[in-house]
Each structure stands twice: as C-alpha cells, then as structure tokens.
C-alpha cells in the first residue's frame, strides 16, 4: 500500500471533487467506518453514529439543507486510497492525524482525541508494554496501532492482523491472540461487550488527534470543512452529539476530554 501511495503522491494525483463542483451538484461523498460503534456503524441497512451525524451536519453547512450525502463504507486501509482516487470527497472515519498520512491527505481541525491502549483478559498480568514480548497481539493494518507495533520491533510483539473491529473481536474470542492494541475510545467498546476483558494498559505511546481528511491540496474543500466545524462548535452541536450519543454509550468509561474538544475550538475563535 505504501508503494502505491508513494506513486500517487509523486504524480500529484488529486481526484476528490472540488468545492465548486460539490456545491453545484449538491452531492458530497463521505467515507465512514462500517463497524465502529458509537462513531459509525452499518445497522439495519443504514449508517449511524457520532461521525455520521457530524458528517451530515458538516455537509449541510457546506452545501445547504438540500445536500445529498452519499456515505461510503470504508475499512482502515481504504481511507487514504479512497480520497486519492475520488471514491470519497471527505473522510469522517476515525482517522488519526499522523505525519505519514499528512504526506498524502490534508486533515481538518480535530474533533476527537485518543491514545493507544491495550485490551487483554482479566488476570493476564500485563502491567507494562514490555510484558507483551512474545504475546500475540491483534492489530488492524492501516491504523496507528499497527504502525506502533511495526515501529517498535525491539518489544518482540507478535502481531496478528485482523480486518476490522468485528473481525478482531471474533479472533480474540476464538483464542487467536492474547491482546488487542487500538485507540482507547474504541477499546472501551470491548469492555462494555465482554466483562471478562480489561484495559490492561490504558496509555501506549503518544496522545493523538482524530480529524476529517480530504485529498491532498484540496484547499477550498478543506477550508469549508474547517469553517463548518467551527460553526457547529459555536452552535453547540458537539455538546449535543456528546450528550445524545457518546455520554450514554460510554457511561463514564472514557474521560470527556477525549470526546469533546470544545476548548480547542473556543481558543481558536478568540
């Protein structure tokens, strides 16, 4: 995948629709994850969740109330290629901002924050990252958790690849791995689903931000997304989505600071 991305980058490819076309056609294609409750998941034939609601609100700000939002389901490894070949105009897909990804796409202001954490069975006695030596650990290609394991070979972690959260959970339940490394805001879902699991390492690596993304150098669309996010923050939309979706789902398992970045937006609007 990295080789393909490099070729596209060198060619200067940018297939995402520009802002003028989106506003003229009143259609915007937005990539969302297919299995990441409470952010985005396909249920009963349609997408729902925090990022889905946010994406639709942003689309209305950019185009108007009569916008047609085409939601495109993506897995982690799809996100950059879909933006580069025009299958999506914008990603609201739990996409962590990283220097590597910034070579190929442009990120908006963040709307969530997170940190890597580790899930294991209760009693597994994993107290520090070095305890993962020779442990089979589930990671999803295309994510920052996958990158973390690959960039720390000295830890001796035996990575087991899985396609998405649902696939990872099944493999864990089937005994194919000892642990699962992913962002804390997604790992909390596992402990809600299975009381035999625990967050054995709540912080692995550095704190991260999650943002929307557009194709590289699609500057007008990026500005429109940022303007929409600022406007929605000032109107209290983030607070509403937090109270309606995230707060009742997590029930205090994730600190509010990860899920609500109004302080960031308030500081930028001064």
What are these regions (language model features)?
Residues 4-13:
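Sec-dependent N-terminal signal peptides
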Residues 32-36, 72-77, 86-98, 140-144, ...:
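Beta->alpha turn/N-cap motifs
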Residues 34, 112-120, 188-230, 248-270:
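Periplasmic-binding protein-like
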Residues 34-38, 47-62, 117-165, 184-185:
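Bilobed "Venus flytrap"/periplasmic-binding protein-like clamshell domains
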Residues 53-57, 61-62, 130, 135, ...:
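Extended ligand-binding regions for polar small-molecule ligands
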Residues 78, 94-103, 148-151, 171-206:
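A ligand-binding cleft/hinge motif common to bilobed small-molecule-binding domains
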């Amino acid at each position: 995948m990295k080789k393909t991305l490099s070729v596209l980058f060198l060619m200067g490819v940018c297939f995402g629709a520009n802002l003028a076309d989106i506003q003229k056609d009143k259609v915007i294609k937005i990539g969302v994850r297919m299995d990441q409750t409470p952010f985005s998941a396909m249920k009963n034939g349609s997408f729902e969740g925090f990022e889905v609601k946010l994406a639709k609100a942003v689309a209305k700000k950019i185009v108007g109330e009569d916008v047609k939002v085409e939601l495109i389901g993506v897995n982690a490894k799809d996100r950059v290629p879909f933006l580069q070949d025009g299958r999506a105009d914008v990603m609201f897909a739990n996409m962590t901002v990283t220097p590597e990804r910034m070579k190929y796409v442009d990120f908006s202001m963040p709307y969530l924050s997170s940190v890597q954490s580790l899930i294991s069975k209760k009693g597994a006695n994993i107290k520090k990252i070095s305890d993962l030596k020779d442990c089979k650990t589930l990671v999803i290609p295309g994510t920052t958790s996958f990158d973390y394991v690959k960039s720390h070979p000295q830890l001796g972690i035996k990575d087991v690849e899985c396609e998405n959260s649902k696939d990872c959970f099944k493999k864990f339940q089937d005994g194919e791995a000892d642990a699962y490394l992913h962002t804390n805001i997604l790992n909390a879902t596992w402990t809600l689903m299975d009381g035999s699991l625990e967050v054995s390492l709540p912080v692995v690596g550095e704190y991260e931000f999650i943002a929307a993304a557009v194709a590289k150098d699609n500057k007008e669309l990026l500005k429109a997304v940022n303007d929409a996010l600022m406007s929605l923050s000032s109107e209290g939309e983030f607070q509403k989505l937090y109270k309606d979706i995230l707060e009742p789902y997590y029930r205090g398992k994730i600190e509010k600071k990860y899920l609500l970045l109004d302080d960031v937006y308030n500081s930028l609007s001064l």
